[in-house]
Amino acid sequence: MRILLIGEYSHLHNSLKEGLMQLNHEVILTSSGDSFKNFPSDFLFTPHICNRWFFAKMRNVLLRLFHFDLEELERGIRFYLLTKHFKNFDVVQLINEKPIQTMPVFERFLLKKIFTKNHKVFLLSAGVDKINVDYILKNKNFKSLLQPFFEDSSLKKHYNYVFTYLNKNHQKTHRFLYENCLGIIASDMDYMLPLRGNKKFIGLIPNPVNVDKLMAQDLKINEKIIIFLGINRGNYHQKGIRYFEKALVFIKEKYVDKIEIIIAENLPYQEYIVEYNRCHILLDQVFAYDQGYNALEAMAKGKVVFTGAETEFENHYQLTEKVAINAKPDVCYLIENLSFLIENPADILKMSNNAKAFIQKEHHYVNVASRYIALWEKY
């Protein structure tokens, strides 16, 4: 089968490609590299010109005066120049409703070319989209990245990208995709729950994790327990990082001789991996039902991760033992759980083994790729 994967989000499509290739399928991945993370692709449409001093200044002026983004335009043009390579695929999968991330009119023009020149096209819900945002706004108690905004509307500027999914221009893109794709697949519980009952929703397939590359090792605790917090200022509020920071202030004072804290900010993917390889405990996010990609890779390596692990997640996978700590936007709760682990290192080792076994069973990249093939072939 010839498969085209368009867009990247936290290494998901890269891992899926690796699994599909293990099954002897021909796979092409094209993306912008997912911003500063610089994920690899067969065909990159990363904007470069706008990084130059003159064009960066011009971009800022145009954004401020006319809300026109030169970077989006460049991204679209670069994708257009690559479209000669994107023909006659058996399956195309788009990640999110804006996989190209150009201007809405240009996005639809490019997507129409993809639909007309290929066979089956599916949409993967692995991030914010119109259906997801609509659901969150109607269900404000739903654990989501928008909760900080609901509590403090002054944070709106940090959520502008979320609300672009509700503007009229994007809604046209949403309707086009919704009417023309063969189905919508969810990558985890956070995207499945808003899709329940939707006629286009065809199933949840867990994020693929390339366990062969990660080389999991038995966790060893020698002198100090190492806690890692990675900070990306672009999603600082959405991940609830401030709750972790406040908890760590207390933990650092209480257990000064028992712990080491690593805080890494805005690192490219490869550097981020090197830093967190040293840790026993990884602090990921507090506003989620399920694990995102960073959490899954850490769990595959046997880290104890504070992330989404709500009851809905445990019920879906029929878990009887904890594979991660369900993080909540509650500093006292986080302190309590961190303290318990620091004082009971045997529980760290036990959960480490549970996490590795869970990833092997539910997220192994080849098994997940097989599930995609089976689902695509139904349509």
Predicted segments, located by residue:
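A charged, aromatic-enriched C-terminal amphipathic alpha-helix characteristic of glycosyltransferases
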Residues: 346-377
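Short hydrophobic beta-strand element within catalytic cores of glycosyltransferases
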Residues: 304-309
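Conserved donor-binding/catalytic core segment of Leloir-type glycosyltransferases
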Residues: 203-239, 245-248
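Aromatic "clamp/platform" in nucleotide-sugar-dependent glycosyltransferases that forms part
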Residues: 286-287
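A short, active-site helix/loop in glycosyltransferases that binds the activated sugar's phosphate group
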Residues: 132-133, 161-202
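Acceptor-binding helix/loop patch of EC 2.4 sugar-transfer enzymes
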Residues: 123-166, 234, 310, 315-317
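Short N-terminal targeting/anchoring amphipathic segment
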Residues: 2-6, 82-105, 120-123, 281
